[in-house]
């Protein structure tokens, strides 16, 4: 990134594919705002043979009826990235070089599994974010890929905890219910990992120490999953996501 000379940077990962219109569309939309931090497109998974999966990994819902959306970056960080990393693949993103260069001391540089999530969060705090509702990126998924193996072994959860703590330190004060719901979702994620009981306990202890979380947050999340069908205005991850 430091050696790049252009206004925007695209990390063209050798194993992934891009539609011929990817850069054209990203630049067109990025140029509509003077402070665009990054612009990302929809992704589809392809296997080792190049076969495209029918699985929907974007979860746009009704948003897909539009061509694109431009969001204030801080709102995108609070309502979208706080819940999960919606920028599924770095090769499907075009980002502003000057903003990225402000992050040379960022904690994401020491992360192995979730550093991209931290990077996009910090980028969003600096300017607008563009979502383009077209699948212009093709994400090759190998069974032995680092992201797949780390999910299977739960090694990335420590970084999840670190990122959540960082986000909460950077965002405006969040509602207690929202923070507890988010922590409950992470509690659920840990519980489902194929890890030893002692490893899970260690992660729960770290959540308690760094986030002030407890098993009560898990049960709040469970009740939220049930009550959302009764109360249409109840906060959920999907409802908090910017439209």
Question: Language-model segments: which ranges?
Answer:
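The conserved acidic donor/metal-binding loop of glycosyltransferases
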Residues: 13-17, 42
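C-terminal, non-catalytic tails of nucleotide-sugar-dependent glycosyltransferases
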Residues: 66-76, 128, 157-183, 209-213
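Membrane-interface aromatic/basic loop that binds lipid-linked glycans or pyrophosphate carriers
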Residues: 169-170, 189-243
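Short, conserved alpha-helix that lines the donor NDP-sugar binding/gating region
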Residues: 1-2
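Conserved donor NDP-sugar-binding/catalytic core segment of glycosyltransferases
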Residues: 21-60
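Short glycine/serine/threonine-enriched helix-capping/active-site loop
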Residues: 6, 38-43, 132-134, 139
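Short aromatic/hydrophobic "clamp" motif used to bind/position activated sugar donors
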Residues: 9
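Conserved nucleotide-sugar donor-binding catalytic segment
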Residues: 60-156, 160
């Amino acid at each position: 990134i430091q050696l790049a000379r252009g206004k925007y940077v695209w990390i063209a990962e050798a194993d992934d594919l891009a539609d011929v219109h990817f850069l054209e569309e990203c630049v067109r939309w990025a140029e509509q705002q003077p402070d665009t931090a990054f612009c990302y497109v929809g992704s589809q998974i392809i296997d080792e043979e190049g076969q495209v999966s029918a699985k929907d990994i974007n979860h746009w819902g009704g948003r897909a009826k539009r061509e694109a959306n431009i969001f204030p970056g801080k709102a995108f960080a609070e309502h979208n990235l706080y819940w999960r990393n919606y920028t599924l693949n770095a090769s499907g993103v075009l980002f502003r070089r000057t903003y990225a260069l402000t992050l040379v001391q960022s904690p994401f540089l020491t992360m192995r599994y979730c550093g991209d999530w931290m990077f996009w969060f910090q980028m969003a705090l600096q300017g607008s974010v563009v979502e383009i509702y077209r699948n212009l990126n093709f994400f090759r998924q190998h069974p032995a890929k680092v992201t797949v193996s780390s999910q299977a072994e739960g090694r990335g959860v420590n970084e999840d905890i670190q990122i959540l703590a960082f986000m909460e330190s950077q965002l405006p004060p969040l509602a207690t219910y929202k923070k507890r719901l988010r922590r409950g979702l992470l509690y659920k994620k840990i519980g489902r990992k194929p890890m030893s009981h002692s490893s899970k306990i260690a992660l729960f202890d770290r959540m308690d120490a760094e986030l002030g979380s407890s098993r009560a947050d898990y049960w709040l999340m469970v009740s939220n999953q049930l009550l959302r069908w009764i109360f249409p205005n109840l906060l959920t991850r999907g409802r908090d996501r910017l439209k």
